[in-house]
Amino acid sequence: MRAIGHFLPHLRGVKQGPEHPATLLDTLLSHQSDSARLKSAHAVRDHFTTADDEGKRAFLQLLASGYNTDGKLLDAAISHYRKQRDPLSLSMLHAASEPRRQTILRRLNELPGGTASIIDMRREALRLKQDIPDFAALDHCFVHLLASWFNPGFLELRQLDFQSSADLASKLIQYEAVHAIDSWQSLRSRLEPADRRCYAFFHPRLGDEPLIFLELALTLDIPDSIEDILRSDREVIDACDATTAVFYSISNCQQGLRGIPFGGLLIKRVVDLLRAECRSLKTFVTLSPIPGLARWLGETGGGAFQPMTDGQDNALIASASRQTLLSRAAQYLAATTPDHGDPVARFHLGNGASIERLNWMADLSVQGLRQSYGLMVNYRYDLDHIDYDHRAFAEGALPRMSSEVRLLAGLSRQQSGKRQQNG
């Protein structure tokens, strides 16, 4: 890691010109007219966006380490609060404890396109974080502000179809992170039929740039293969005849918003829409990958399962290990906690879902075989249990699971609600 001084040419004794980032940031923080402040914000943004990686690192480290809380102001606020101990002095103390970098970010947000610029700045910070010694302090400010600016009240839910703009459609192809869309015909098959839907969240400051999108299928039963969802020669059903909504792909679109939670809210909002539209819907499930399974097996003595990457032949060979692999997968998912385990499992279980079923050879793509030996899982959103299961999982209970999954994991009914101390 580079020495701190490498990033801080603004240290005492180094001459600062008008285009030096410290000069630009100090000017932005100073008392100015509205027009002068916007001009300063433009200068800061232009400096960052045109800088190379070395310049971006230096700027971000300067922002992280050089614009903390004003110590004198904080000491005065603490002293005042100790004397008064009233709501006003507490509010003043809170304001005084805020790092000056948050004021800088707020002023950058005042620019046209300012919110997008801050998202881009955080994306770059995440990319370069290994070379930003004080990244954690900086990212705390990014997350604090972005979580407020992107709270549910500001989010717009839209249904996307094949008549959506070509620009928006191309973004769906670009951002799809679970099951690649390899052609316009493939996109059409996901958006146009009566039993296929796609929904996305948008923010008024980002226009037609999606934050996250969710693809789903309306079916007559719970599917056990992604091929059943994606194949083009399937029989299309009327949406009002469907009994099951299957969420099979959810993709975050903005790297700079990583860690800002949208997915759980999107699923719940879509469930409400679907229930109002299709009274026949009774079951809400996912068909989800298990991206951490192969790695976990390799780390926990599962080396007997050889990596599979070339499709059906390996899938057939692996069938001899079917029961063992299903059991190990069930154990892996059952051990999920809010902070540990498969990332997709943490997401759905943290939103109140349960583990419904493991599906053998459900994804025979190269990625599906490599990361989970072709296994996929159905998580179930039982509307009568979501809130309870969300709280229980957050408080340390084992995930709720069907009797089939519980049996595969080797758990008794008595064990299913309680996490072992060593697990």
Mark where each language-model region is:
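Extended, composition-driven regions rather than compact fold-specific motifs
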Residues: M1-I260, G264-G423
